[in-house]
Amino acid sequence: KRQVYGITKTPIDKANEQTKKEAYQAVFADASGFNQQEYDADAADKMVADAGYDDTIDDVEQAIDKDGNALGYVITVTAKDGSQGSITFSVGIKNDGTVNGYSITDISETPGLGMKAEEEDFYSQFENKTVDKFTVVKQKPASDDQIEAITGSTITSKAMANGCNAAIYYFCLLYTSDAADDLIGV
């Protein structure tokens, strides 16, 4: 058993790293690189929880252009309130607070329902929006902060919106709060 684990661990780790890199690039297509940011995961999770989100902040990367200028951040979140368990995804947020979108790295929702969170009809609703938070609605959205739920999968829709909201909240703390130094480990 241990020998099989040793043989498969390195390829699995490499595949996971590649999946992350692809997710980062998907939410920051104009970035030429990403710098991992040190942050206090426990402090970040507590602040997000204190704001009412049952999500965790798993990683923070700074997106940079070819000259090394900061474009924004990629914040990887695990939403724990999906209908079939946790959903892990990366959210790209520009320096001005505009959400570029999200890219899912781990999901096991119901095929034909919750899995539609990976489809453009749903995820495109989050792209290029500057909002304080997203709200899920069952009808056509009337404003930028509204996301039309996936038919038959309101739980997954809300999990995705809440995860994006947790990332937005954390991003705002990085820029607008005295707590920023604690959050990023400065």
Describe every region a protein language model picked out.
Residues 23-50:
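Short extracytoplasmic
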Residues 153-157, 162, 169:
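C-terminal binding/interaction regions
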Residues 80-86, 95-153:
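Flexible, solvent-exposed short loops/turns enriched in glycine
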Residues 1-11:
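Internal alpha-helical transmembrane segments
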Residues 175-180:
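Conserved small/polar residues in nucleotide/adenosyl-binding loops
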Residues 57-89:
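Structured beta-strand/loop patches that form or line metal/cofactor-binding pockets in enzymes
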Residues 10-30:
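Short extracytoplasmic/periplasmic juxtamembrane "stem" segments immediately C-terminal to an N-terminal membrane anchor
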